[in-house]
Amino acid sequence: MDSVETRYAHLLQPLRDLTKNWDIDLASQLGEYLEELDQMTISFDGGKTMMNFAEAALLIQGSTCIYGRKVELLHTLVFQTLDYISNKNKKRDKQGSSSDGNQEQAPSGSEGDGCEFDEIEQDENVNTHNITMKDPTEPVRIIRLPPESLIPAESHEKQKYPLLSLKGELLGSCKDFRINTFTMDEAGLMRLGSNTHFLKGVAEVQRDFSVHLPEPLQIEGEAAAANGGYDEEVDGGAEVLPPLEDHGMEVESDEWVERHEAPSEGRMLRPRPAVQPVSEEPKQLKETVDPWKLHDPYATFGEDKPLKAGKCYKVPAGLDESGKRKRKGPSKLQDFGTWFNKAFETADRKLKNGPTFPDLNYIFVSKMDQRLKVQRQMLRKRGVFVSDEELKKTYLEPENVEDQVEVIRHPDADGDDYSDEEHDNLADDLEPAEHLDDQEQIFQDLHMSRMSYEDLVKKSVDLFLVNSQKYAQETALSRRVKDWEDSINPHLAAQEISPAFDIHEYGDRIVHALSNVGVKKSFAFVVRGKENTEACRYMLAALQLANDYTVEVDKVDGLDCSVDTMELTLLTTQRAHERLKTYNATAATDIP
């Protein structure tokens, strides 16, 4: 054991330096280990079962290669993600610099990010990428972008737009000359440089001013002597131009202009007076209104006015008798009770023996079983038998306003009542009050023989209408559903009655049918006289036995000829699941 531990010590102990992994020759060591496993024999059950460790080692080697590929793919995806983030930040910085011009701006990035990626610094000698995270508290270094005209163009950009002379000679590229760098605006005009972009707003302002005809030129001396330096009348109709704003352009000083002006004594344009900029009045901020101020019970608004008593005037008697047409007064408010009953009237009808309010019918129906049970007991004591359907009809009978209370007629012809029913009220008084109406109704239904012929006809017609509604509401779809239920219910009942499927029990039946080892019989012989469901179960059990090498499956060659030619050959009578129950693995010390 000591030699084995010293031999594989570099594999058992964790490696602190990852570079030492490449010094290990896994291929040679794995080959030696496979040779040892090939010579090693581990058997169970007296040599019947053999353990093949060579296949296990090859499987481990293949899984190691797959794992190495996955690690390599993950390494590549990480660096692709970092490159994508870096390029995205660079594009965002370029877009921000082109829109803001020469103004100073902060580096791009969302405010919510706690940290940002710096550019990936890569050493020439080391093949590792170092990524440093920025501290948000450090001051940001603002890098000024050079003008576009000072950035040298690349060689392929120069060849893209060549500059040719009239003779067809190649003079250079459009990028070589400052005047040839232009941009296209919305109107399709060429704008030379960025200064024209700044003058775009000024040109739009100049269009709003009125344009006048040019005035004749005057000699500088005469104009100055006549009007003291400028003509007021002519200047009154002159065009007033707004001052040009400085958008980052360099304005030449007056001294430099005077030094380069050529002396001329000819006609000169009169000087235009400077236009004073109109001072803008500061906008007054609107007072913010506090929406909760009016809800403050302790706040005071204005001054408290003293209470003044009003004066009462008496209307003269003849004022209302004038001939003026009186206006129609406002409509009277509807009674709340009437409006409430119409608005919240339910579709449920009031039951004759039910609760006062139809909304409570569901409670009355839920307690129907208890009521029927009590009434059935009371009727048994009286010796009267009534079906449950008749009792339910008495409870669920709707109330009809036009019905009049019918007096129960006694069977005596003279109308004299000599029965003991007058004492029944004494027993009813001892019962709860909620059952009084129900008992009276049931008592009336029990004496249907005493009812008139007209009442019996009405009751029969009502029952016929209720039963006919069921057939009127029956549709083709409901009939199809009913037919399907009638056809499927016998099959479901048969499945419930059939015994549970035990694959081992059916396997024992097949082994018992084959009787001895080496006997070969057809599958049709085994399942002869069985139902289709039983044949399917025998088929599953036969496939399980073939998988356990208990039986061997044969068939005739050919597609058409092999139909219903399945044959089973018994290989062993010992079942696989029984062998697993009695299986005992040998100890490690017993291995040679």
From Swiss-Prot:
UniProt keyword annotations, A-Z: DNA condensation, Nucleus
Cellular compartments per GO CC: condensin complex; nucleus
Keyword presence, Nucleus: yes
Pfam families listed in its UniProt record: CNDH2_C (PF16858), CNDH2_N (PF06278)
Superkingdom: Eukaryota
Subcellular location: Nucleus
GO molecular function per UniProt: chromatin binding
UniProt cross-references to PANTHER family, sorted A to Z: CONDENSIN-2 COMPLEX SUBUNIT H2 (PTHR14324:SF3)
Complexes and interactors: Component of the condensin-2 complex, which contains the smc2 and smc4 heterodimer, and three non SMC subunits, ncapg2, ncaph2 and ncapd3 that probably regulate the complex.
General function of this protein: Regulatory subunit of the condensin-2 complex, a complex that seems to provide chromosomes with an additional level of organization and rigidity and in establishing mitotic chromosome architecture.
Name of the protein this chain belongs to: Condensin-2 complex subunit H2
Organism: Danio rerio
